[in-house]
């Protein structure tokens, strides 16, 4: 196994060893790691962007706000971010924050705070600053899950008071 973060381990276990491990006093929870999935092709429809854009006008633009996004990875050179990427951190241990396999992390970050300079569509907070937490293993494209406590605390300590997580699983999981 490998240490994921404080108090969490990930690894394979033989079925015959499951009861032995479950009976250890320090073990609070055992379960399968959920398989996460992402979908880039449904955002405008699910977010009802057209309804919001046509419904009201506001002067809010995200100025002075730090937003954290935990997702696959980030194309940090994408023109919509400028110098507003405060940090781009690998939270799964593969040493990379790139968005090699899906583009989902960049898509989500642009939806939140893209300024529209790269394609004409601005995000909902185009002047906000970004803390990005990369959750995709670039070696195999697997989307991994650090503990929510870890990623939320890391982002909070860097000034983020908004954290968005646009991923999930069809499997039931209590991440402990």
Spell out what each predicted region is:
Residues 1-56:
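Autoinhibitory propeptides
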Residues 11, 144-145:
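A conditional alpha-helix N-cap/helix-loop micro-motif detector
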Residues 14, 117, 147-148:
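Amphipathic coiled-coil/heptad-repeat helices and related helical stalk/stem segments
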Residues 18, 105, 145-149:
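Amphipathic alpha-helical segments in well-structured domains
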Residues 18-19, 120, 152:
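Short glycine-/small-residue-rich flexible loop motifs, especially phosphate/cofactor-binding loops
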Residues 23-24, 53-89, 94-144, 157-162, ...:
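Subtilisin-like serine protease catalytic core
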Residues 149-158:
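Short, well-structured alpha-helical segments in soluble
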């Amino acid at each position: 196994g490998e240490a994921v973060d404080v108090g969490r381990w990930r690894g394979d276990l033989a079925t015959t060893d499951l009861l032995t491990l479950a009976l250890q006093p320090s073990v609070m929870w055992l379960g399968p790691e959920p398989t996460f999935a992402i979908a880039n092709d449904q955002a405008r429809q699910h977010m009802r962007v057209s309804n919001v854009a046509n419904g009201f006008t506001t002067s809010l633009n995200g100025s002075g706000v730090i937003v954290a996004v935990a997702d696959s990875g980030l194309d940090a050179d994408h023109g919509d971010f400028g110098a507003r990427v405060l940090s781009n951190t690998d939270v799964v241990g593969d040493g990379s924050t790139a968005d090699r396999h899906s583009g989902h992390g960049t898509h989500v970050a642009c939806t939140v705070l893209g300024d529209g300079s790269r394609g004409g569509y601005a995000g909902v907070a185009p002047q906000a600053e970004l803390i990005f937490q990369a959750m995709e293993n670039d070696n195999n494209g697997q989307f991994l899950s650090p503990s929510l406590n870890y990623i939320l605390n890391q982002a909070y300590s860097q000034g983020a008071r908004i954290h968005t997580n646009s991923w999930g699983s069809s499997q039931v999981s209590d991440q402990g």
